[in-house]
Amino acid sequence: MKISASLKSNYNHHDIVVMTDETAKEMQISPQPIGFRSSVSGAELLLLSLATGFCNDFYREAAKRNMAISGLEVVFTGEFGEEGEQGTDFTYWAHLLSDEPSSEIEDLIQYTDRIAQIHNTLRKGVSIALTS
């Protein structure tokens, strides 16, 4: 899977497109009321990416196990300091609605945590290269 995300920022306007292989989807994120910056920070989007990735992976794995899940809430937190500093203290919790046995739910949560792609990308580290 080839994944990409693009952002074109102009005064009071953002064009955002995310793409998986050849499937593109437009997204809306408002700019700040005055200026070029986004109303949502990159740190907030990173944590949303982790929550979304866990959620999608969780539902996929629940379906493989034929588990009925009626809802899931995932909350990620992290600390970010001054410009240039990396984030720290990333933690999360997941709460779900299901009539499945609690031991099976806990097993699925732990399994999903181990195999979640976005989590593992950050846990194992990734190089980022600026190209021209």
Specify the residue positions occupied by each region the protein language model found.
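Extended beta-strand/beta-hairpin segments
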Residues: 1-48, 56-132
